Amino acid sequence: MINNVVLVGRLTRDPELRHTPQNQAVGTFGLAVNRQFKNANGEREADFINCVIWRQQAENLAKFAKKGALIGITGRIQTRNYENQQGQKVYVTEVVADTFQMLESNKTQGQQTSKPQAQNKKPQAPDPFKAPAADPFAGGTEISDDDLPF
């Protein structure tokens, strides 16, 4: 059987890092993933997916990723159930991420540092290679049927 998930989306909140009684790191986070199509109003909708990540990957995610970060994850879908305080059975479906990858630099995420502005900037000479190339076929050439070799 195949149970593989690959998602790209933005974190809906900062990852929450906890540890099990056996001191294993476990992180939980939400991922907003845009749908491929637009709705009747022409707007793109998103799915909000609950995810779990374990061990060193969980620690790294909590350390480096914050709400709004664009990440990619690979993992699997998992279902579980438990009984809540009211005695009702609750069913949960979530993605258990095996790996994640940051898809934007820190600068892109809005953590840009200010760049010093150049004080005496010299005007740049025009780049001869950026000039539009002339179309060699633009004018066309008149050819009579007598000029053709066949």
UniProtKB/Swiss-Prot annotation:
Disordered, as annotated region: 103-150
Biased composition (Polar residues): 103-120
UniProt superkingdom: Bacteria
Low complexity compositional bias, start-end: 121-138
PROSITE patterns for this protein: SSB
Chain ranges of the SSB domain: 1-104
GO cellular component: nucleoid
Gene3D superfamilies: Nucleic acid-binding proteins
Gene Ontology MF terms: single-stranded DNA binding
Key words of the record: DNA damage, DNA recombination, DNA repair, DNA replication, DNA-binding
Motif (Important for interaction with partner proteins): 145-150
GO term, biological process aspect, one: DNA recombination
Classification via SUPFAM superfamilies: Nucleic acid-binding proteins
Subunit structure: Homotetramer.
Function according to Swiss-Prot or TrEMBL: Plays an important role in DNA replication, recombination and repair. Binds to ssDNA and to an array of partner proteins to recruit them to their sites of action during DNA metabolism.
NCBIfam families linked to this entry: ssb
Descriptive protein name: Single-stranded DNA-binding protein 1
Organism: Lactococcus lactis subsp. lactis (strain IL1403)
Organismal lineage: Bacteria, Bacillati, Bacillota, Bacilli, Lactobacillales
Gene: ssb1
